């Protein structure tokens, strides 16, 4: 866990936001609290923030500031305020984004409220109501979380404004009276910020209290094993929240990696320049001497015109050339650490400046020779200092490259960890989504069975009301017998059905059949498909349900033309795996809602019986009196 970052206010308790431990979240909520990175350190040493004794009445405590002091302070204040302004802008951007999320959260909460009202008004299942109640609690907590986040950003804004005023008060260009006025404004803004801190802290505490209630509610649901979808929804929402937070963190980590990579590139360029500078210094004549005096001796020579005037005997001008040569490491080191005079005396063993009667001339020549060594010494010292400075710059650059390399590694490791977390979240989400889909499938399956049972019961009731108890019992018995059975061949079915058809034609004429055909034209294809699916479920048909409205079309043609083979061929193709229950389900779905009358009922039931069990044809005959 990262260390809490705090807003430090003199004389007031601080409000701390822990970016991990206090992250505003609930079962499905991941609201990022404001990152209080503006005030993680103390104000500049020169700041009057928390130290209002810098003014002594109407006079400066210290001596009046110099122009240099004023300009230095101006630069410090400008740099400090620029930093605060950038952080304030970032804070405002975050607040704006939080405001957008709050608006979306309010809309989501209102939608959940309306959905819950609709479910309650419609007498929905208790599980669905429980699930929606839990969703509403989540939505309410999310909304409050964003309000808490915004309160934190508002507190940060006030703190920043306070520090800017304190910084303005520290200008050396204003009078003590003006400074005092600014400090009073800053103190007022600071007090407002502290009040905002308390408000945000109270809201955060309230948020945690509400979150605890929601967590407890979730635990109860999990413990009781009820409202499985509500539990899975909560787990899904939690992971989605983690995913959102992870995506933001990945974006920040990538930006961080890009930034440190650019810093590393800059550091490497600086190292290259430092190495080039060192090479350049070492390749100068004097630089070469510093590196290898044996290979590149250091030389210096000067032409002189020395005037001698003291002794008339030697009066005149002496023209000489002084020279100095360093061609080994020992002499070089000695010269660099001693004077030219010491070198001449101790290394060259030239201790006596006067060697002739011309004392004045000898001394001036000696001094010129000493000066030549000092001249060479200074050149070599300058070269050595430049090389040393370049080497120091290289060491510093290498250290910087090493630090930036480590920083890049840490940033890359952090990004990889977040990417790994992202994949883990994705995997968990996939698992949760699969479980949710399975729970919904189970719920839909249960609801479909309920609907199928109700539809079948309503169908039998309708048959009873329209055609009597015998017809209703016939439908029930045929449905029962068809379950788990296979249909006969088309030829066998036609043979059985022809007996019924021949008897039927003796009693009913073409006008009766045309009335049935007309009724079949009124079949609602959509309703038929829905009913077929439910009847199939009720009769235990587990194969793939195929919508075959064209079978009903063939039925209509057969009734009209009395040519039944095409119909039976189509009906056979309907029964996947030759399942008799599919044929029965189709027949019931055609008759439900279609005014086929007792004759149409008899024809359809006889056709199904011919395919399933022709013993029922006799019952159909009795039903219509043939």
Curated annotation (Swiss-Prot):
It comes from the Bacteria. One of its GO terms (cellular component) is membrane. The chain crosses the membrane at residues 588-612. It holds the Pfam family Colicin_Ia. InterPro entries: Channel_colicin_C, Channel_colicin_C_sf, Channel_colicin_cen, Channel_colicin_N_sf. GO terms for biological process: defense response to Gram-negative bacterium; killing of cells of another organism. This colicin is a channel-forming colicin. This class of transmembrane toxins depolarize the cytoplasmic membrane, leading to dissipation of cellular energy. Belongs to the channel forming colicin family. This is Colicin-Ib. It comes from Escherichia coli. The lineage of its organism: Bacteria, Pseudomonadati, Pseudomonadota, Gammaproteobacteria, Enterobacterales. The gene is cib.
């Amino acid at each position: 866990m990262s260390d809490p970052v705090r807003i430090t206010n003199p004389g007031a308790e601080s409000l701390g936001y822990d970016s991990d431990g206090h992250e505003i979240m609930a079962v499905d909520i991941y609201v990022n609290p404001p990152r209080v990175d503006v005030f993680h350190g103390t104000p500049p040493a020169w700041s009057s923030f928390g130290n209002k004794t810098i003014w002594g009445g109407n006079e400066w405590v210290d001596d009046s500031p110099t122009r240099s002091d004023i300009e230095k302070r101006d630069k410090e204040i400008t740099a400090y305020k620029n930093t605060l302004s950038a952080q304030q802008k970032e804070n405002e951007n975050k607040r704006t984004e939080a405001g957008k999320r709050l608006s979306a959260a309010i809309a989501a909460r209102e939608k959940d409220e309306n959905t819950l009202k609709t479910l309650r008004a419609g007498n929905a299942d208790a599980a669905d109501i429980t699930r929606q109640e839990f969703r509403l609690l989540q939505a309410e907590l999310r909304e409050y979380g964003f309000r808490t986040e915004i309160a934190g950003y508002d507190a940060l804004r006030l703190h920043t404004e306070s520090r800017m005023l304190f910084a303005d008060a520290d200008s050396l260009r204003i009078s003590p009276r003006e400074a005092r006025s600014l400090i009073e404004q800053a103190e007022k803004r600071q007090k407002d910020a502290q009040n905002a801190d308390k408000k945000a802290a109270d809201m955060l505490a309230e948020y945690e209290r509400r979150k605890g209630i929601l967590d407890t509610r979730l635990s109860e649901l999990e413990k009781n094993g009820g409202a499985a979808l509500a539990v899975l929804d909560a787990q899904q929402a939690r992971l989605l929240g983690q995913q959102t937070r992870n995506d933001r963190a990945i974006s920040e980590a990538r930006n961080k990696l890009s930034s440190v990579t650019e810093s590393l590139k800059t550091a490497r360029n600086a190292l290259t320049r430092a190495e080039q500078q060192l090479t350049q210094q070492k390749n100068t004549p004097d630089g070469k001497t510093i590196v290898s005096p044996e290979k590149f001796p250091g030389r210096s020579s000067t032409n002189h015109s020395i005037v001698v005037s003291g002794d008339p005997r030697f009066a005149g001008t002496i023209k000489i050339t002084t020279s100095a040569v360093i061609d080994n490491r020992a002499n070089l080191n000695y010269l660099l650490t001693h004077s030219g005079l010491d070198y001449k005396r101790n290394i060259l063993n030239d201790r006596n400046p006067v060697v002739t009667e011309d004392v004045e001339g000898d001394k001036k020549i000696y001094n010129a020779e000493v000066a030549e060594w000092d001249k060479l010494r200074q050149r070599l010292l300058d070269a050595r200092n430049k090389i040393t400075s370049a080497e120091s710059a290289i060491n510093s650059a290498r250290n910087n490259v090493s630090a930036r390399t480590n920083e890049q590694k840490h940033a890359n490791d952090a990004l990889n960890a977040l990417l790994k977390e992202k994949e883990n979240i994705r995997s968990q989400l996939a698992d949760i989504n699969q479980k949710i889909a399975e729970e919904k499938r189970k719920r839909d399956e249960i609801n479909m069975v309920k609907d199928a049972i109700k539809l079948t019961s309503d169908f039998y009731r309708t048959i009873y009301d329209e055609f009597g108890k015998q017809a209703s019992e016939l439908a029930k018995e045929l449905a029962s017998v068809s379950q788990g059975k296979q249909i006969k061949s088309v030829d066998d079915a036609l043979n059985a059905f022809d007996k019924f058809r021949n008897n039927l034609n003796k009693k009913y004429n073409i006008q009766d059949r045309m009335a049935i055909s007309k009724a079949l034209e009124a079949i609602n294809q959509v309703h038929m498909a829905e009913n077929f699916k439910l009847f199939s479920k009720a009769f235990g048909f587990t194969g793939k349900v195929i919508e075959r409205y064209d079978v009903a079309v063939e039925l209509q043609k057969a009734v009209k033309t009395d040519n039944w083979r095409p119909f039976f061929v189509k009906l056979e193709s309907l029964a996947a795996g030759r399942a008799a229950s599919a044929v029965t389900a189709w027949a019931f779905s055609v008759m439900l809602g279609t005014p086929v009358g007792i004759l149409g009922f008899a024809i359809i039931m006889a056709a199904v019986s011919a395919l399933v069990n022709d013993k029922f044809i006799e019952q159909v005959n009795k039903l219509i009196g043939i």
